[in-house]
Amino acid sequence: MLNVEPSFAEELRSSGVSLSATYLGSVPVVESINVMVSEMRVQVVSECIQHVAATVGVTAAREINPVVSRVIGEVKKENFPVDINISSKMIKIIKQSRLIQRHPFSFFSFGAQGQKGTDTELMFGYIAKNKDGTDRRCHVVFIEDVHKLIDVLTTAINVNTFDAQANASTSNDGFTVPAPPMRHRSSLHRQSFVSNCRAPTVTEDVVGKVWYHGNLSREDAQALLKTEGDFLVRQSDHTPGKYVLSGRTAENEHKHLILLDNHNRVRTRDRTFSNISELIDYHVNNGMAVRSEGRDRETSLNLIRPVPCPGSDDIE
C-alpha cells in the first residue's frame, strides 16, 4: 500500500514538484555504488559534497579521504541558481527554463545530505548516471530547505517503486502475471536513500577494534600474519567498502574471506550475524573456525590471535 497523500502522488506522477536551489557542480564516481557497503556510500557522497563545495569556493578546502579519492574524478564547477524538478520518474535540473540535467530513477543510485553541524549541512548530493546510462556522477546542490528536498525525493522514489510493482503484477488484458526478476525492475529496489538520520550499519562497530586495520592491501595484511591463528579485519584498498577477514591457516596459507554478501549481510557458511564484531566474538569465544565455501573448496580459519592495528590498544 502506498502511504502518500493521493493528490501529492498525482502531482509527482504529472508535473512534479519544483524547488529553488544552487547547483554547485558534479564529480565523476568511477566505482559502482553496488559494491560499496552503506557507510562507504555515505562517505563517498559526503566527500563529494565537500570537494565540490570547496572547488567552487563556498567552503574551505580540506584533504580528501584517500580511499574516496581513488573512486572520484575532477570536479566540474557550476555554481548557479536552478530549479530542481522532482517527479515520480526522474530528477530534472533546470537553469533559466533550460534543462541541463535529467536523471531517470532507473539510473539513480544514492543520495545524502551534507554533514550536520558543518558548512555543508544545507547541501545535498546524489549519485546518478545520465539518461542514456553512462557518466556516473555525484551532483551537488545547495538548498535552504534541504529537508523538504529529501522528503519530496523520498516520496517520489516510493511512488515510482509502487507504480513499477503495480505495473509488473497486472498485464494489459487484466490477467495477473508474475513480477519480473529483480534485475529487470527499477534499480530503486536495490538502492538506499539516506539523510543524516540513519540506523547504525553492520560495519560501523569495527572502528576502534584492536583487530581492525582500516584500509589495508592483501600483501600488507599477509606480512602481518606470522603464525597459525593470526587474524585481522581490513577494508580492501582496491574496492572501497569491501570488508575482508585475513588469517593464517594450519597449513601456513594466507586466506582472505569477504565478510559481506551482495545484500550487505555479514555471513559465513553456517550462519548470519548482525555485525562484524558479533562474527569475530562468536568464533573467538567459542573456539570455532570461520568457514566459507568457495568455488573450488571450503576455506576454514581459526581465530586465535588478533593482530593489533598500530596505534590501537592491545586489549579492547
Swiss-Prot record:
Checking CDD domains in the record gives: PTB, SH2_SHC
Tell me which tissues or organs this protein is expressed in: Expressed in hypodermis, intestine, head and tail neurons, pharynx, gonads, vulva and body muscles.
Please cite one Gene Ontology biological process associated with this protein: positive regulation of axon regeneration
Q: Does the keyword rRNA processing apply?
A: no
- Which residues are in the SH2 domain? 211-307
Molecular function (GO) terms for this protein are: insulin-like growth factor receptor binding; mitogen-activated protein kinase kinase binding; mitogen-activated protein kinase kinase kinase binding
Assigned keywords, A-Z: Cell membrane, Cytoplasm, Membrane, Nucleus, SH2 domain, Stress response
Region entry Disordered, spans: 292-316
- Could you name the Gene Ontology cellular component terms for this entry? cytoplasm; nucleus; plasma membrane
Entry annotated with the keyword Nucleus: yes
PROSITE patterns named among the record's database cross-references: PID, SH2
Q: Kindly give the InterPro entries that the UniProt entry links to this protein.
A: PH-like_dom_sf, PTB/PI_dom, SH2, SH2_dom_sf, SHC_SH2, Tyrosine-phos_adapter
Chain segments annotated as transmembrane: none
PID domain mapped to chain residues: 16-158
What membrane topology does the UniProt entry give?
Answer: Peripheral membrane protein
Output the superkingdom of the source species.
Eukaryota
Q: Where is the site described as Required for interaction with svh-2 found in this chain?
A: 234
Pfam families attached to this UniProt entry: PID (PF00640), SH2 (PF00017)
**Cellular compartments annotated:** Cytoplasm; Nucleus; Cell membrane
Primary localization: cytoplasm
Purpose: Scaffold protein which plays an important role in the activation of the JNK pathway composed of mlk-1, mek-1 and kgb-1; by bringing together mek-1 and mlk-1, promotes mlk-1-mediated phosphorylation and activation of mek-1 which in turn phosphorylates kgb-1. In addition, negatively modulates the activation of the insulin/IGF-1-like signaling (IIS) probably by inhibiting the insulin receptor daf-2. Positively regulates the activity of the transcription factor daf-16/FOXO by both inhibiting IIS and activating the JNK pathway.
Query: What is the annotated quaternary arrangement, including any partners?
Result: Interacts (via PID domain) with daf-2 (via cytoplasmic domain). Interacts with mek-1; the interaction is independent of mek-1 catalytic activity and is constitutive. Interacts (via N-terminus) with mlk-1 (via NPQY motif when phosphorylated on tyrosine residue). Does not interact with jkk-1 or sek-1. Interacts (via SH2 domain) with svh-2. Interacts with svh-4.
The name on file for this protein is SHC-transforming protein homolog 1
Q: What does the organism's lineage look like at the top?
A: Eukaryota, Metazoa, Ecdysozoa, Nematoda, Chromadorea
